[in-house]
Amino acid sequence: MPTSTQMKSKKNLHGILGVALLVCSEILMLKGIEPFASWFYYCAWWSYILIVDSLIYTIKKNSLIMNRGGEFLLMLFWSVFIWTFFEAVNLVLKNWYYVNVVAYRFIRWPGYAFAYATVLPGVFETTELLESLGVFKKSRVKPLSVNRYWIVGLLTLGIVSLGGVLLYPTYCFPLTWGFLIFLLEPINYLKGGTSILREWERGTLRKFYLLLLAGFICGALWEFWNFWAVTKWIYTVPFFEELKLFEMPILGFLGFPPFTVECYVFYNFISLFRYQRGWEEDTYGPNQGKRVKFPFAVGTFIAVSLFCLLTFSAMDEKTVNSYWPDVGELQMMRPEVLEYFASRGITTPHALLATIGSAQGKKELAQKCAISESEITRWVHLAQLSLVKGMGTRNAYVLTVIGVESFSDLAAQDPALLYDKLVTLAKEQLRPKGTAPPREAIVRLWVREARKKASNHQKVP
């Protein structure tokens, strides 16, 4: 245990770094400067983790990064695994998808890991901050007498919930954010690990309440920061596609609190295989001298890494809907025009619209490149189309094959019929190589968003 003098000697500067990174990335994102516009989510969450950890250290002179750095680094690894596990579940659920993802795999896959590594530190740091501030400090409940009926009941509920998620995902998808609690918490309790049930036996559910509140806070931040990023996720949750806050259906926010409890229980389960060493101040110290056997550690690392890589590959095929947009993929310009734009750094629909979106911009380009203004107007419409719900330039090009060349054209489509046409194109191999037709739920979102844009466009005098 470090002395008070040693603790005071530590430089608590990472919070300042976090604030600087958050402010700078926010400004650069709003200006549309890459890579901050696309990767704003990454910058925001790593900033948040640094800031919160610094606050915790300021309050109690003990924090995850400053005093439990080894556990923090290990947590990053398990955070990637745990969220990748839910990505694997989403291959069945189809509740969300990603847009405007970087096209190069050697960047994209590390990007997945870099983003998913923030999940556990984000929720656990928030939980510890709330605890440090004394939230729910005096909360007490009637002690629970845990018996075999509780254990069997929870395990049964977990098995039934998992079965429902896998077999009837359309109706049972909410159980995704709870089934691991029911499955793993009884095991944690029986094996003597850190357990919410054991705390309940002692007449307190403070940790449970803190986790729920931390989940709500982090959920709000997840959705808020995701909303502004170019590279982002979008939800296609059954029955709740229309009423949303940011990109999340309103009722979906109820899933974040139990998800945080699920992460806590999952991490405690993993800790059973590490002599019950945990991330919290009171569970980090015991058994520090004991180490997991090297073959077991290596085997675990290989198995987890292989699982993540296989899931990343499946996500590329099933969950990623669009890549970073490139105007060249719209196949609407002559090579010399593309070269002209490339020489000026105009390679994305956003940059194209900023250049030729106005009447003056169209006129100047028409004069320089000997192109009719009507042709330039078509480019503008296609660029606007590619931005509808992060559809991307590849999907926009496919829509042009079936006669949809603007968001007004898209707004006039019947979603079900349009989806059938896109499936037919895929069967006839008329889609760009390496792309799959979007799910019907995604097509519905496109059409709904296009109708909003068309309606707003008509209201403009």
PLM regions and their residue ranges:
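C-terminal extensions
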Residues: E317-P461
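Aromatic-rich, lipid-facing transmembrane alpha helices and their immediate juxtamembrane interface loops
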Residues: P2-G328, M332, Q458-P461
